[in-house]
Amino acid sequence: MLNGKILFSLFISSIILLSTASYANSSEVSKTINDQNMKNTEEIPIKFNRIIITGNCPFGVIMANDLAYKHVVGVGPWAFLHSNMKLLKDMKPDIDRITTDFINKDYVVNMESLLNLQPDIIYYYGKSQNDNLERAGIPTINLDAGGDTKFEPVVTQTYWENEFNQTLGLPHSHKFSDAWKRSLNEAKPYAEKIKSQHIRALYLEQSDGKELKVSGPKTYGDTYLKMAGMENVASDLVVKGDAGRYINVSMEQIIQWDPDVVFVVFGSAKDILNNKNPGQDWHNIKAFKDGKIFSTPVGLHNWGGLSAETALLPLFMINKFNPDYITDAELKVATRLHYKKVFDYEIPDALLTDELRQR
């Protein structure tokens, strides 16, 4: 029987192979435009001049392609709601031109407002974001790759990058596949060490003082923990549908799990460590006693979702669990490199420090 290390190596290898296969099969554009001859990309005409994206996660991918980004006129409000706007405006000084007003406060598309934007193409993610968009009478593209991609971030982001390039008539690129390869290769030896220690982690999607929602099995959160070599304490929970990936649990359930480390996505690790959330008492949980409760960083979006920076999340998790494995300085170097390679952006020291601080 294969031992744990071999199984983990196969897990990482399969992720990298899947991402490579995903973009290798999408070479229609690259047949006519050589990736290595990109000096005159500004002259390449785009098929659609006014782009709308209803979801927040794919927006981070299109931001990495200036040829496409400059044509985005509307995006879902979550794209900015959970962003570090200081960083976003530093990278994209024109970001204020992009509106979110075509989506109402109840997250339903306002068709009149949408049509006023005169879009040429609309991208959405999954049935829950469709909202009868065909009423607009223009091309609509579903960015849901289907199947198990709901918990495969590498394949999903690679698919989005390919889909944007193909539908907009842009050159083939593989920035996000490459980013995941860099991160997973750097994380691998340390993730294997952590795996041998059987570290039990909780991926706390939401902790707002009212609800506690966690990532169960076959979710992005579950995958991120595995990438860092950790075991998901909520792996036995039942996941149902898109919304089912966020599972409500009680404080008593978390006490019973007694995780070694907790990663907080939408919420504040500081509030938990200071016991500021009403109805929650974390005192007897190992992660609390050891001070191992951390907020996922917020950059262009929250790293803990599926953002433009999520490829860095396994490195962040390893760094927080044991800074002797990946130091704070090494995490900063990796983050700088990511922004440079994916966005051609030099992040200022102050913004990088702010992004990685505990919330």
Segment roles from a protein language model:
Residues 37-38, 96-111, 238-251:
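Short helix-initiation/N-cap motifs at beta->coil->alpha
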Residues 216-244:
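Alpha-helical, coiled-coil/dimerization segments enriched in small aliphatic residues
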Residues 25, 41, 129-213, 295-358:
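Extracytoplasmic substrate-binding proteins
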Residues 1-10:
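Bacterial N-terminal signal peptides that target proteins for export
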Residues 20-27:
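Sec-dependent signal peptide cleavage junction
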Residues 52-54, 73-76, 121-125, 140-144, ...:
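Structural recognition of the beta-strand scaffold that forms the well-ordered cores
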Residues 9-19:
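Bacterial N-terminal signal peptides
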Residues 53-116, 121, 126, 230-233:
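A short, structured surface patch at a secondary-structure boundary
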